[in-house]
């Protein structure tokens, strides 16, 4: 029995070595990952059936409790049998592939064993099929719980399946006395050796898969880190400043010997070896880069000649050049250099390809973000441009009437009119202006209106003097005051009062324009400022435009709040958090610069 066990260990060693080689193949790993498809199942059946057939051929032939053949077995004497590791391949295949794969392996391995002959040919064939199905069911049980069977489970299943084979031999092989003698001789060695072999085989597969998963997780983390650190720079587009920072990040995190980024004509950044002659902005791109830009395909170089660097002492002897695209057009290249061709491994190639696709996506997103920002700014300026001085003709008529009676007042009104239009023109070109300028604009407007209706309007200004330099959208207060003067007061109302407040606390700036006019009808109030709509009193376009400008610059929290009571008056207000106001100022500076 000991001698048989030693020889069985040799057979298991053959299968384990084959399993070690197999686990490193891409075909096997892909089959494990895609075992739900017919192709993956077919590959697993083929591989483990081959293992089981090899186990049949390398079995140890036994007759009358004696080892008669220790070489490869191609036929078995009718009174003989073999001790082998066939069940190991059937069981492992079933555990990894499920009942369909296990049954397929069991049928092929069993038919092959049956073809060799011997007193246990039929019982071994039947046990192979049952072992494959049962191992497959056990494997599916674990797979449904999103985990692979452990080596310990594999060992227990191996012991169980081999024990099942011994029972089937006792039940089916004739005469029973010979079957009993055979099982007494081979049972313990085969059960122990197949259990041990199953443990080792699955341990190897799990270790290699775990190692690959760890490597993949590490690469994923590295790529995500690079993406996170480079995204702010690619938002700026493909320029020298952004590319220098990006190249430094890639060089640091990938460990390549040098990294270059180019546009279609010149090197934008080069970090690492060769910086003395790969000079940004002064060096034209190489012929290799031109080919990549022209074809849009990845290219590799494994010699200094293929890199096409003209510097005789350039330390770079291998490179991979990848296209950077935006909206389907190649706009530049990413070049990763190595001092030795050995550094350009498959892992580095896949990393470079992933980074190129990621960077291309970032460039497209940056371009889309820029276009969206420009469109948004254009919309805001278009809304500002709609705030036209509709009272122009009335102001001119008023000034014309005063020319003969009060020349000095006429001169002052003309100056105020010029201030008003100058502010209007400047405001149409800016997203934000200081509050002090807005107040000058408002005072110019009020001077012209009060000249038309002397003594009619009482204007109260409650302005926190500390806020005069804060940046606000142009025409905000003027539009709200103009809206109140035009719509709030009936013609016969004696005291027409408008209050303008600009106050703040530590968190927000509050602006409010209130009047004591006739109020807004309840059926109109809910929609006012949210959309233009025709009515006898106006279209609501001014408030709608102002509301859209505030939301566009500061977000929904800066939207207008309108409250009103009929015959008592209306209050229009909004507030902007200090942080949002600072961000709006930075945004405006970026647009106006």
UniProtKB/Swiss-Prot annotation:
Q: What is its EC number?
A: 2.7.13.3
Q: Which UniProt keywords apply?
A: ATP-binding, Cell membrane, Kinase, Membrane, Nucleotide-binding, Phosphoprotein, Transferase, Transmembrane, Transmembrane helix, Two-component regulatory system
Where is the protein found, in the record's own terms?
A: Cell membrane
Enzyme class name: transferase
One GO cellular component this record assigns the protein to is: plasma membrane
Q: Which residues are in the Histidine kinase domain?
A: 363-580
Q: Which residues form the GAF domain?
A: 238-363
According to the UniProt entry, which residues carry Phosphohistidine? Answer: 390
Protein name per the record: Sensor protein LytS
- Which GO biological process annotations does it have? cell wall organization; signal transduction
- Give the reactions, separated by semicolons, that this protein catalyses: ATP + protein L-histidine = ADP + protein N-phospho-L-histidine
**Keyword Kinase belongs to the record:** yes
The topology of this chain with respect to the membrane is:
Multi-pass membrane protein
Q: Where are the transmembrane segments?
A: 13-32, 42-60, 87-109, 118-138, 153-173, 185-205
What lineage does UniProt assign to this protein's organism? Answer: Bacteria, Bacillati, Bacillota, Bacilli, Bacillales
